[in-house]
Amino acid sequence: MKRNQKEWESVSKKGLMKPGGTSIVKAAGCMGCWASKSIAMTRVCALPHPAMRAI
């Protein structure tokens, strides 16, 4: 999973240079929360992801 998180980080950094980059960062952060199954962090995430509801 660490490999996937690095890929998400690179995507979020590229997204910061474009309009709407904040939403990409949020999505990457929420996926990171979901991947780590950190319940406290998933509650902080603003995007309702279908996979999040399963937790």
Curated annotation (Swiss-Prot):
Result, substituting residue 41 to N/S/T: 50% wild-type amount of Cys-thioether cross-link made
Phenotype for residue 41 to A/F/L/Y: Approximately wild-type amounts of Cys-thioether cross-link made
InterPro entries cross-referenced by the UniProt entry: RiPP_SkfA
Up-regulation conditions: By Spo0A and PhoP, during nutrient starvation, especially phosphate starvation. Repressed by AbrB during normal growth when nutrients are plentiful, in association with the transcriptional repressor Abh.
Sequence position, cross-link 2-(S-cysteinyl)-methionine (Cys-Met): 33-41
GO BP terms: defense response to bacterium; killing of cells of another organism
Entry's localization field: Secreted
Keywords: Antibiotic, Antimicrobial, Bacteriocin, Disulfide bond, Secreted, Thioether bond
Pro-peptide positions on chain: 1-29
Keyword Disulfide bond: yes
Effect on the protein of changing residue 33 to A/S: Cys-thioether cross-link not made
PTM section of the record: This is a cyclic peptide. The first step in SKF maturation is probably thioether bond formation.
Signal peptide interval: none
Phenotypic consequence of gene deletion: When the skfA-skfB-skfC-skfE-skfF-skfG-skfH operon is deleted, increased rate of spore formation; a double operon deletion (sdpA-sdpC plus skfA-skfH) makes spores even faster. In a single gene deletion no SKP is produced.
Covalent cross-link site, Cyclopeptide (Cys-Ile): 30-55
Recorded GO CC terms: extracellular region
Disulfide bonds: 30-45
Additional remarks: Accelerated cannibalism by skf- cells is seen on solid media but not in liquid media.
Its job: Produces a 26-residue extracellular sporulation killing factor (SKF) that induces the lysis of other B.subtilis cells that have not entered the sporulation pathway, providing a source of nutrients to support sporulation, and at the same time delaying commitment to the energetically expensive and irreversible onset of sporulation. Can also inhibit growth of other bacteria at high concentrations. Addition of SKF to solid cultures induces killing, but it is much less effective than SDP (AC O34344).
Cross-referenced NCBIfam families: RiPP_SkfA
UniProt name for this protein: Sporulation killing factor
Organism classification: Bacteria, Bacillati, Bacillota, Bacilli, Bacillales
